[in-house]
Amino acid sequence: MSQQNRRVQQNTAAFPLLTAHDILECLAALDIPAQMEDLTKPTAQSTQSIYGSLLEVLMGASINSIEGPKQALLGMMEYKEMYSDTLQFMMFFKHCRRLALLCGIPDFAISDLARPDANRLRKVLSGIMNFAKFRDERMQTQARFQENLQKHQKKAVDLRRKTEELETQFQEITARNAAERPQSEQAQKRNELLKSELLELNSQRLKEVQEYEELKKERQTLLEQVNHNNRIVTQLELQIGSAKSRLVQSPDRIKRHISEMSFAIQSEKAKLASFQQKARELTNRLEVIGALEVDLRGLIDLEHSIQDQRAKTEEAKRSKSALEARLEGRQIESQGLAAKLEQLQRQLQNASHKLARQEETRKGMRERGARRIDELKAEYKVRARERGEWQKQRDDLLAEQKELESEMAAFVTKHENEINEFLHAYWTMRRQAEDYMNTMTVKLGLQVQL
């Protein structure tokens, strides 16, 4: 690309260009050693060292991570010693180009590594520093999301504990109901006996009321007869008094009449006494009937209270059945959620193990890369003296470069697919965790505010 085109793209960059001093400060903040000369008068070695450190800090791709794929590719090629350095350089360029694309620099070329320019290096590093600042800002958001995830996991543990407490309460209620079932059955039998006895008493009450009404009528009749007899006795007494006051010629007739009247009076008095005795008996019977009425009202009230208690018992049974059905549904739902949570935890554990293995592999590759760098530095000093001979082979290498680039593209694509699969598995697991937390929120009536 010409210098003029690069100036045009520099003017239309999507990020601000930093000064060399600002770039040095940013590199120092990332613990990347660099001097002002490395920016104003860059060399291929210093530039590649800066880019390598940036790859390791920002993308976790160190020189060691290149060594393994490089050895795998060299295993499929002939003349390994001839292609080793070139292959490593091309793989390093591929990583740098990917970082540049992420930072909004689409025109990153091999010349930026092999023949670096100060202005060009300043532009690329400005874009990368802008990306690093953006990454630091988003790391806070990611930490906040991680904290929210931990809170949700804690809530899930609390909900699981509450579910276990509900199960314990349900078991206690079931055991208490089982213990109280004999008493309930006895009370129900007693209620049935009381009900049958109450029905008998009610029928007896109806008979007593009917008999009471008949006795009242008979008492009223007897009272009327007593009053009538009293009036007759009074009239007879008046007649006797008037008869005694008169003198008659026939004392025998008067005596006979008097004896008849006395006999009639005695019979009437005896009848009156019998009526009074019967009236007293009727009064006693009425008192007994009144007491029976009071007892009957008490039994009726007892029947009403028993019916109310029975209605409450039926309502309690229905509430208990509804609670048991609801608790059973919650238990089934809790078991499903627990199984889903265990599955997510297993997936997270597998991903953690896979990440740990990759971290160990990356660490080992970094150590091998460091040793390889030392070897390459020593070899570079030797090869610097042999550069003239290598220059003759440059044309042959350029002819084979296309084939090598195709093989490298296939290799990079393969590893990109592995990374994409890992990222896809991570986001799938995260979506499943979010779905699980949303399900817990909806089912248990919680409202989570992030």
From Swiss-Prot:
Look up the coiled coil feature and give its residue ranges: 142-232, 265-414
Q: What is its main location?
A: nucleus
Keywords attached to this Swiss-Prot or TrEMBL record, sorted alphabetically, are:
Cell cycle, Cell division, Centromere, Chromosome, Coiled coil, Kinetochore, Mitosis, Nucleus
The entry lists its GO molecular-function terms as: microtubule binding; protein-containing complex binding
**Pfam families registered for this protein in UniProt:** Nuf2 (PF03800), Nuf2_DHR10-like (PF18595)
Question: What is a biological process (GO) this protein takes part in?
Answer: cell division
What InterPro entries does the record tag this protein with? Answer: Kinetochore_Nuf2_N (IPR005549), Nuf2_DHR10-like (IPR041112), Nuf2_N_sf (IPR038275)
The protein's job, in short, is: Acts as a component of the essential kinetochore-associated NDC80 complex, which is required for chromosome segregation and spindle checkpoint activity.
Oligomer and partners: Component of the NDC80 complex, which consists of at least NDC80, NUF2 and SPC25.
In the record, the note on similarity to other proteins reads: Belongs to the NUF2 family.
Protein's recorded name: Probable kinetochore protein NUF2
